[in-house]
C-alpha cells in the first residue's frame, strides 16, 4: 500500500517547471540567465495579459506552479524571457483558447493591461515558424502610446506552446528587426524541444 501511495504521488505531482526552462546556451552564445523578482510562484504574479488585464483571463486562477527567468547578453539589444507554468487539468488548454480569443477581439483603441501603465494601443499580428508544438500561438506585439510624456513605439514577440497541462511562453524584446523575430523563433523552438523531452536540452551560465 505504501508503494502504491508513493507511485500515486509521483503520477499526481506536476512537472518541475525549473527543469523545463531554457538554458542560456539554448538562447544563444554568451547569454546568461537572470532571476526576476516576480519569477517564482503564482501569487501576485501574472502570466497572461495579452491585450487585456490578467483579470480577463480566468485560467490565471488555475495555475499551480510557475517560473519566469530572463536572458541577457552584454552589448546585445536582444533579450528574452521564458515562463513555464503548470495548470490544473485542462487549464493550459483553456489558457491557449483565452489568448486566441483576446487576439481575435483586441480593441483598436488604447487599453489598460497593467495598472502601473497608462492606456496603450496593442497591435497583434500572428506569425509562423517551424519546429514548434502543434497549436502554438506566435504573436508580433506592437505597443504604441505615451508613457510619462514620452512617445512609446515598441515591438516584441510572444510565443505560447502547450504540452498537456504545461504552458511555456517565450517573450523577446529589442529593436523592431527581422533579427528579433529569428531570435524569438529560435528560443521557441528550443522550448518546444524541452517540452517534448520533459527537461532542458542544454546548459549554460547563470547571473
Pin down the residues of each PLM region.
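Stable alpha-helical elements in mature extracytoplasmic
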Residues: 23, 92-95, 99-102, 184-191
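A small/polar (G/S/T-enriched), proline-flanked helix-loop surface module common
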Residues: 34-150, 206
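Short N-terminal segments immediately surrounding and downstream of signal-peptide cleavage
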Residues: 13-29
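Envelope-exposed proteins and targeting segments
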Residues: 18, 78-80, 156
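Short, low-complexity, Pro/Ser/Thr/Gly-rich segments in the mature regions of secreted, periplasmic
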Residues: 187-207
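Secretory targeting and sorting signals
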Residues: 1-12
